[in-house]
UniProtKB/Swiss-Prot annotation:
Name this polypeptide is given: Alveolarin
Key words, A-Z: Antimicrobial, Fungicide
Disulfide feature: none
Entry keyword annotation includes Iron: no
GO biological process: defense response to fungus; defense response to Gram-positive bacterium; killing of cells of another organism
Species lineage: Eukaryota, Fungi, Dikarya, Basidiomycota, Agaricomycotina
Function recorded in the entry: Antifungal activity. Inhibits mycelial growth of F.cinera, F.oxysporum, M.arachidicola and P.piricola. Lacks protease, ribonuclease, deoxyribonuclease and hemagglutinating activity.
Complexes and interactors: Homodimer.
Species this chain originates from: Polyporus alveolaris (Hexagonal-pored polypore)
The organism's place on the tree of life at top rank: Eukaryota
Length: 9
């Protein structure tokens, strides 16, 4: 959402 690992994965 804001640039987290889960967001990019």
């Amino acid at each position: 959402g804001v640039c987290d690992m889960a967001d990019l994965a």
